[in-house]
Structures are given as structure tokens and as C-alpha cells.
């Protein structure tokens, strides 16, 4: 091994991480728990209990916790499943628990010997599911809610927590187009896109705090992720609930002995697929205008960090007594990107506690977290340049690109600059709960979420921008700060009438304030690169009068809400939930600050009918229907208000200096209100064959009203030619199907499978009225060279994601693309270069997958388990920019894809946006394969051990000729464009260990 590499900082970090991971196997220490005086009295007065704990196959359960409920007195079972607990009183209750089994409570009642059988925790109808401002037993849900617990998360390395449930929830799309970039998070969309200007991302709620940031979480700290999909479930969150709500619950402490858990892994990324570019010899042989500069460079490979390494370590401490429970964790995570520039290091602390006092009258609890992320960024433009650049240039070549804004050295573009950020995330909240009566309580919650980001960038004088701009260095410092304050006061009351009518009532008040500040300063032309971005005043550029190198900005938003909910259960047969939220928000127009968001849902437990009374097949069968009104408010703050803006500096003869000119910066709209969404959902939940088969089916319709758009207005009377107004209407329809089947269950072998299938179709019904008219909205134009225009358009009655362009009609004798005039196939043809608006039509297909599929399979043989997880998207198209720009021979001197001289060899002319480049995006991928070992250990110190290996992105079946179909955005308003600035797709290998002491 190269000694210099071994002793480098990077080498030391890698070696240390590996040592830490392996050292977890050799820990041999006990953790002592102090014994309370009250427990000493128990020891002096009780008796000795012995017993055996087995599973439903009669095998001993090794390492099960056996404790006296409400105390820390207890023991764990040995290799034979036996236990001994001394000095236990006759009226005590034993609590037996083990991972993967249902917790069991057994009264002592004077016994001294126990034979205990634990049941596997499969589909538990009594499972408690978190919902908005509360929780519910799973079997009593009346809305479309899906919860994924930590035991069902996808294994392996992730950039953000939602990747652990990607494909696990029908109707939820997690679009990770650059999964191997450590600083990139995926976009999330629930049941399609419906908004033009107010956002399509769901609300994130972490431990009850709305507006949370998922990157403030270590994946090992998450207990469950719950998605509120329909309007009735999300309406309790008012103007932020229309895009769905994601509730994240972190792990909490449990009463009993204190446990220490280590959860860690190491990982490595491989390039899974890359563009098929001509090598240097093929380039010189085939490309017109090719020039040989004497080198043989694979630009794409030069950008890849083949020795990338990632590691993640989480240590947690958890435990408690009858009155106090706690959990604390520390996390360190480091990941190098698949490219030579990107990197990320994270350090985090998280803790929570709950203390009950005054004989249960008062509960005090809280959460805190602090996380630092040190980020180094990359530039995706380098990967675009790596495809088109002459492969005979030297890796160090710079002079050839002077004054050329089109071509640059992609390697130097990354190495000749420092670009990154330091981010701090913090959360603290305190909860006070007063249990006035057994069925009446009130809770006060105060919380603060903070996020600070300091971005710094320095381009050396050898960077392409500095060379072309003729200045020595460029520096930028940018600071952003987000602060969210939350105050909530809730009350809960429950009562029963004649043991048949069960009522639960919740009412509350919510206040939330969002503050945002932003500051940016830049300069250029420095005497030296040595100071980087730490010497802004040294640059000469901003010293010239009339040049302003600083900007600052501040925003504030407030939300106040009064909310209530009632749950009614008649004899466990008929269930009803109704909720109402009255909310005011400072973002809206002066005359529309307040909104009302009602919701209602009902369910009928069909399995209670006499026909199912003695059925051995039907455990639970429930039909439900829901209606809800939600809102959407994700547009920019102050859009409704009048704003003044600077319009440049002007020299004043009167004052002898430059003075900033100000004027109205927009057209205010005091009638601007929240977007409304009316949702209907019909669903069925089923559990069959002693919980072996379970699942759900949902059909939904969502109607968007008062959708915000930007509309042209006349000058005068308006001061500007555009205004924001509530005009549009949208619709989304679809259905979702989920099924879980424990197919085989024997003593040594089991097999379970689950399938999720979702169909979604979204359409823009209209976005014009008598006052505001807008014919259509064009998507983003394609990049230079040339001006090919846009490939997508939004128009009344057209599906979101529709493609718009020419119909391909072949080529002429010179190899120029021909199109059908007026889009009429079989009619008159013309040159694509001569095409006009009259020749454009809506092309077949959209960029939104109609079908989303996931299929999970888990096999267990004795102590080993194997899981395979497949994902797929179907019935959608992709406009392949790679083929359009690099798969044609027309641009002289640029490198090409091999397809330019193979599949596309007949095309010699310029690119044209037509359906020739519109490809089938369908794919099926073996996304995750995990092999794990969970041995039954013969040790008193280690209660649980799991070792696993995960391979992600194993293979992909697709006809798409681009780099990878998953690099194409399929969410938002403009899905299905296969861009060129594409980060490499990775195949990830992870080895991990989980140990509980």
C-alpha cells in the first residue's frame, strides 16, 4: 500500500471508520443501572421466578427482555430461552419483549414457573398509527393513511430518509435523479402534481413539528414514516395539506433496562451506466472536423472518483423507569460523491425524554436535535461537457478554451474552484401534558426549528470563468437563516355511552411564525488566490462606483389556526371522523387572510356482518369513504402585497454620487387567496386468513380550484404586464392497491411478499376566466447551440406532462429531418427546420408514469434472511436530449454518442424537436437486494446482533437509450425531459452491523 495515501487524512478517516465498525464485534462491557430505593424494598420481599420463552414454533427466544413492569428489575433469556428473575412480588406483572414479536404481559399471581410463547408481530390490527395532531389504532382508520415502520425500511445507504420508503407507499413518488450525489435530495410527490405556482411537495412534520427538514434526521433515529394521502386526513393541516402530509416519528425511550445500540455501515459506489461516447480513435475516424491534439482522454472517466467511500455510525442510549423514559443518540456520517468534487460530512445529536409526576397528573416531555453538515458541491455541467468535448485534448489543457463559452475543460471546472457550504440544523421542543381526568387532558407544546447555511465559493484565476472574464479570481459568500416557531395548545376528551357509542374529541390552537434572512456578498479580481473567499475587500472589481457586490433580504410569515376533530365509533361497526380547521395566513391578500378547511370520513366494518361471524378467512374487512378540503400556499411571500424594487444606480449631479432608483416592483393582488383542493376517496382495508393476507385498495379524485397563475394584464392601468391571480382548475384521478402476504411460515423457513401498484392521471382543466386570459404555458426551452424551443406545453384540457412538437416523417436525400405538415401523418412533408407553430401538435404520451409498481420479497432460513425489492414505472415517455444533441452527426468537431453513426446514421441534418426523440421510459429494476444474518447469541451482554450486506440498483430492464431512466424527473409540471447535465447513476454496495447491548 502506498504509505503516503495510508497516512493521508482521507486514508486515516477510512481506516478509522472500518476499525470502528469491526470493533463493535469485540465489545465486552456491562452497563450498570442504579437501583431505586423502592426497588430495593421489592428485592427484600419478593420471590424468585424462572421460566422459558419460545416462539410459536417452540424454538427458544434468545435475548428476550423479561422485566417487572414499571421497574428496571429483570433479566434476559439465555441460549436455551430460559430466565431467572429474583425477588418479585406476587402482584407484579412480567413484561416480555423481543424484536419482531408482540410484547406480552403476564401477571405473576403467586406463580414461580412460567412457560411463555411469543407471537410474531406481523400485520397488527392494534398497531397505533400517528395521524395529524394525534394517533389512532390502525383498524379504526377511516382515511387513506399508510405507515411504514423502521423494521420495513429499505436497507442500505441513503441521502435522505424518504429513500428508505421509496416504493413502500402506493401513490408516493420519490424522484432521486442524482442518488449518488451526497448533497442531493430527491423530490417527493403524493398523488400527482396539481399546482402551477404554489408548489407540489408535501408538508413534512417531524415529531409533531410542521415544516421539518428531513436532512436533520439520521436514518437510525426514525421509528416510522406515515403518509396522509387523502384530503380528509390532511385537512387538519389546512392551507399546507393539499399535497399530502408526511409524518416522521423518531424513536423514543422505553421503560426497562438501559440499552446501548450501535448501527453502522460502510459503502462504496460504482458507476452503473454511462453514455456510450466515441473514444479518441473512433472520434478521429468518424467525426467531421475532428482535430487531433495528440492525447487520448476519456473525459467521463476522469470525472469519476473510483475510490469513493462512505460510512455511517449511530450510537444510541435508551431506557427508563416507570416514571421517566429517555433516548439519546450520536451520529457521524461521511460520504464522498461519485465525482471528484462532491463530499459531505454530518455530525448529529438527538435526544428525547418524558417524565410523569404527581401520580400521573403531569407529563413533561421534550425533543432536541443538533446537526452540522459540511458540504462540497459539484457542477453537473462538467458531465455534459465530458460527452461533447474532443477526446484528444490533454486533461490539463486550458489555453484552447480561452474566449470560448461553449467548450471548457470539465475536470478543471471542478478542480479550479472551491464551492461548498456549512449547514446547521437545530430543533428543540417542550411538551406539558395535564391529565385532568382519565378521559380528559390538555397539552401545551412550544418548539423552535433553526437552519443556518453559509455557502462559500472561490474560483481560482485559472478557472474558465476567470480566464474568459479576464479577472484574477472570483469570491462569493452567502448566508441564509431560517427560523420556525411553533406554539400549540390541544385538548382531548373521550367518553362512552352504553359501551356502544365511543366518542373522542380534540380541539386546539396553533400558531407558527417563519422568519427567513439572506445575505450575499461577492467580489472579483484579487491580488492572490491564497485568501480564497476570506478577503472579499481585496477584490478590485467592486471598488468601482456603480457596482454593487452585496445583497440582503428578509421575509416573515405567520399562521394562526383553530382546529377540532371528533371520532365516533359505534360498536366497532360504524366509524366516523370529522374535522375542521379555521386558518389565517399573512401571505394571502388583504381580503382573503382566513380560510376554512372541513373534512369528513366514515367507515363500515363489513366483517361484523353475520355472514362473516364464523368465518376463518376474514379477520377484518372495512369499507371507507372520505371527503376533505385542503389548501396550498407554497407561493412566494409578499406576492399579494405591493413591493418596491431597486432599478439600478444612477449618477446624481446634485449629490455627486450614484443613487439607487426605486419603484413599484409588481402588481399587487389583494384578492389573492389559497388554492383549494377538494378530495374524494373510496377505500377498502382487508385482513384475511389469520393476518396472513392483508392490504388496501383506494380510488381517489382530487379537484384543484383557484389555482394560482401568472397572467398578462394591460399597461395601463397596471404598472407591470403580469399579475398573480386565482383562476385555474385541475384534476387528478387514480387508484392504489397494496397487498401483503405471508406465504410460507414454518419453523426454519418463511417467505413473505408485498406488492404496491398505483395509477395516477393529472390534467389541467382550465386556467382562464373572463378577467384573466392565458392560452397556454410553454415549458423551458432547450439549451443552445441553436434555438429548438420547448418540448412541452400546458393548455386547457391537456394532461400535465404532455409533449408538444413536430411529428417525424423520415429524412430527405441529404439526411435532413422531415416532419408532417400540420402534424397530419400521411399528408404533406416538409423540412423540420422550416416547421412553424401550425405544424406542432400534442405528441403521444406524457412524461408522467401512469403506473408505479413495487414488489418486495423476503425469505428467511433459520438465522439468515434475504430480501429482494423491485421497482418499476410504466406507460410514460421521455424526450431524450442526449440523442437529440449528441446522437446526431451535425455539430462539427464535437464528440458524439456511438448512436450517431449507428441507429441515427441516416440523419445528417440539424436537430428538431419531434417524436423521433420521444422514447419509451418504461423500466423495471431490481432496486435492492439484502442478505442478513441475525444469530442467536450465547452471551449475556449482547441482546441482538445483525450483520447485513446490501446491493442497490442491481439491474434495470428498459428500452430507454439514455443514461438511465431514473435520472429523468417524473414529478412536477414538466416531467419526462431527459436532460444532459446528468449525474452518474450508481450501483451501491453496503456492509452494515447492528448491535444492541
Region roles according to the model:
Residues 445, 508, 565-567, 623, ...:
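Exposed, low-structure sequence patches enriched in small/polar residues
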Amino acid at each position: 500500500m502506498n504509505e503516503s495515501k495510508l497516512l493521508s487524512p482521507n486514508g486515516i478517516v477510512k481506516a478509522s471508520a472500518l476499525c470502528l465498525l469491526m470493533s463493535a464485534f469485540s465489545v465486552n462491557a456491562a452497563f450498570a443501572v442504579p437501583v431505586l430505593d423502592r426497588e430495593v424494598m421489592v428485592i427484600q420481599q419478593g420471590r424468585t421466578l424462572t421460566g422459558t420463552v419460545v416462539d410459536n414454533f417452540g424454538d427458544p427466544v434468545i435475548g428476550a427482555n423479561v422485566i417487572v413492569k414499571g421497574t428496571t428489575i429483570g433479566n434476559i433469556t439465555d441460549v436455551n430461552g430460559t430466565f431467572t428473575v429474583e425477588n418479585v412480588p406476587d402482584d407484579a406483572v412480567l413484561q416480555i419483549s423481543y424484536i419482531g414479536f408482540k410484547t406480552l404481559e403476564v401477571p405473576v399471581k403467586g406463580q414461580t414457573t412460567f412457560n411463555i410463547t411469543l407471537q410474531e408481530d406481523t400485520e397488527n390490527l392494534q398497531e397505533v398509527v400517528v395521524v395529524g395532531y394525534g394517533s389512532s389504532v390502525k383498524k379504526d382508520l377511516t382515511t387513506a393513511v399508510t405507515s411504514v415502520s423502521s423494521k420495513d425500511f429499505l436497507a442500505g445507504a441513503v441521502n435522505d430518509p424518504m429513500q428508505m420508503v421509496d416504493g413502500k407507499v402506493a401513490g408516493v413518488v420519490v424522484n432521486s435523479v442524482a442518488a449518488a450525489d451526497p448533497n442531493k435530495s430527491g423530490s417527493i410527490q403524493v398523488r400527482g402534481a396539481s399546482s402551477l405556482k404554489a408548489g407540489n411537495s408535501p408538508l413534512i412534520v417531524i415529531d409533531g413539528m410542521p415544516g421539518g427538514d428531513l436532512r436533520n434526521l439520521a436514518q437510525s433515529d426514525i421509528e416510522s414514516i406515515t403518509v396522509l394521502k387523502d384530503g380528509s386526513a390532511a385537512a387538519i393541516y389546512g392551507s399546507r395539506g393539499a399535497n399530502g402530509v408526511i409524518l416522521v416519528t423518531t424513536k423514543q425511550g422505553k421503560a426497562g433496562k438501559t440499552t446501548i445500540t450501535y448501527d453502522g455501515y460502510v459503502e462504496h459506489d460504482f458507476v452503473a451506466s454511462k453514455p456510450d461516447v466515441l473514444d479518441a480513435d473512433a472520434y478521429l475516424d468518424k467525426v467531421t472536423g475532428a482535430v487531433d491534439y495528440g492525447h487520448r482522454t476519456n473525459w467521463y472517466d476522469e470525472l469519476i472518483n473510483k475510490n469513493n467511500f462512505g460510512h455511517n455510525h449511530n450510537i444510541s442510549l435508551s431506557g427508563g423507569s416507570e416514571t421517566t423514559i429517555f433516548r439519546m443518540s450520536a451520529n457521524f456520517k461521511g460520504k464522498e460523491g461519485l465525482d471528484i468534487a462532491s463530499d459531505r460530512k454530518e455530525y448529529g445529536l438527538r435526544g428525547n425524554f418524558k417524565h410523569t409526576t404527581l401520580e400521573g397528573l403531569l407529563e413533561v416531555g421534550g425533543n432536541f436535535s443538533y446537526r452540522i453538515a459540511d458540504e462540497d458541491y459539484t457542477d453537473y455541467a462538467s458531465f455534459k461537457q465530458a460527452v461533447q468535448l474532443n477526446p484528444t485534448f490533454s486533461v490539463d489543457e486550458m489555453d484552447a478554451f480561452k474566449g470560448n463559452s461553449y467548450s471548457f475543460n470539465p475536470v478543471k471546472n471542478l478542480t479550479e474552484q472551491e464551492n461548498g457550504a456549512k449547514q446547521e440544523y437545530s430543533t428543540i421542543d417542550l411538551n406539558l401534558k395535564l391529565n385532568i381526568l382519565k378521559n380528559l387532558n390538555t397539552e401545551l407544546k412550544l418548539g423552535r426549528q433553526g437552519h443556518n447555511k453559509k455557502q462559500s465559493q472561490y474560483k481560482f484565476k485559472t478557472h474558465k470563468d476567470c480566464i474568459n472574464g479576464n479577472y484574477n479570481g472570483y469570491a462569493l459568500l452567502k448566508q441564509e437563516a431560517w427560523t420556525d416557531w411553533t406554539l400549540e395548545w390541544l385538548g382531548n376528551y373521550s367518553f362512552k355511552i352504553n359501551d356502544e357509542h365511543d366518542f373522542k374529541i380534540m380541539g386546539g390552537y396553533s400558531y407558527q411564525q417563519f422568519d427567513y434572512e439572506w445575505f450575499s456578498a461577492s467580489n472579483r479580481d484579487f491580488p492572490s488566490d491564497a485568501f480564497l473567499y476570506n478577503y472579499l475587500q481585496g477584490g478590485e472589481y467592486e471598488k468601482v462606483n456603480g457596482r454593487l457586490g452585496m445583497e440582503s433580504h428578509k421575509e416573515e410569515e405567520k399562521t394562526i389556526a383553530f382546529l377540532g376533530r371528533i371520532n365516533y365509533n359505534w360498536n366497532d361497526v360504524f366509524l366516523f371522523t370529522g374535522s375542521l380547521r379555521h386558518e389565517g395566513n399573512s401571505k394571502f391578500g388583504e381580503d382573503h387572510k382566513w380560510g376554512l378547511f372541513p373534512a369528513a370520513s366514515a367507515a363500515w366494518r363489513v366483517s361484523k356482518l353475520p355472514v362473516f361471524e364464523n368465518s376463518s378467512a376474514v379477520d377484518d374487512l372495512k369499507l371507507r369513504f372520505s371527503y376533505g378540503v385542503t389548501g396550498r400556499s407554497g407561493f412566494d411571500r409578499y406576492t399579494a402585497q405591493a413591493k418596491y424594487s431597486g432599478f439600478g444606480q444612477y449618477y446624481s449631479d446634485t449629490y455627486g454620487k450614484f443613487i439607487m432608483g426605486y419603484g413599484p416592483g409588481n402588481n399587487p393582488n389583494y384578492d389573492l387567496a389559497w388554492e383549494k383542493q377538494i378530495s374524494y376517496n373510496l377505500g377498502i382495508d382487508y385482513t384475511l386468513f389469520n393476518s396472513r393476507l392483508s392490504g388496501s385498495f383506494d380510488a381517489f379524485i382530487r379537484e384543484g380550484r383557484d389555482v394560482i397563475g401568472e397572467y398578462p394584464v394591460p399597461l395601463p392601468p397596471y404598472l407591470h404586464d403580469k399579475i398573480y391571480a386565482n383562476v385555474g382548475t385541475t384534476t387528478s384521478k387514480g387508484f392504489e392497491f397494496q397487498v401483503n402476504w405471508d406465504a410460507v411460515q414454518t419453523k426454519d423457513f418463511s417467505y413473505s411478499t408485498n406488492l404496491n401498484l398505483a395509477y395516477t392521471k393529472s390534467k389541467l382543466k382550465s386556467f382562464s376566466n373572463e378577467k384573466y386570459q392565458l392560452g397556454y404555458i410553454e415549458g423551458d426551452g432547450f439549451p443552445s447551440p441553436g434555438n429548438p424551443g420547448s418540448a412541452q406545453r400546458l393548455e386547457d384540457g391537456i394532461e400535465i406532462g404532455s409533449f408538444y412538437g413536430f411529428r417525424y416523417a423520415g429524412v430527405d436525400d441529404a439526411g435532413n429531418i422531415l416532419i408532417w405538415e400540420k402534424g397530419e401523418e400521411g399528408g404533406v412533408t416538409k423540412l423540420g427546420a422550416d416547421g412553424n407553430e401550425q405544424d406542432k401538435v400534442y405528441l403521444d404520451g406524457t412524461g408522467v408514469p401512469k403506473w408505479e409498481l413495487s414488489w418486495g420479497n423476503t425469505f428467511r432460513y433459520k438465522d439468515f434472511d434475504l430480501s429482494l425489492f423491485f421497482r418499476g414505472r410504466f406507460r410514460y415517455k421521455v424526450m431524450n436530449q442526449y440523442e437529440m444533441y449528441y446522437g446526431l452527426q451535425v455539430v462539427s468537431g464535437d464528440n458524439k454518442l456511438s448512436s450517431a453513426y449507428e441507429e441515427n446514421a441516416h440523419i445528417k441534418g440539424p436537430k428538431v424537436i419531434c417524436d423521433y426523440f420521444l422514447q419509451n421510459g418504461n423500466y423495471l429494476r431490481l432496486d435492492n437486494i439484502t442478505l442478513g444474518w441475525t444469530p442467536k447469541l450465547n452471551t449475556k451482554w449482547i441482546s441482538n446482533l445483525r450483520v447485513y450486506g446490501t446491493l442497490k440498483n442491481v439491474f434495470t430492464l428498459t428500452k430507454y437509450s439514455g443514461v438511465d431512466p431514473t435520472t429523468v424527473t417524473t414529478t412536477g409540471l414538466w416531467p419526462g425531459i431527459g436532460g444532459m447535465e446528468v449525474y452518474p447513476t450508481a450501483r451501491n454496495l453496503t456492509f452494515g452491523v447492528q448491535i444492541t447491548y
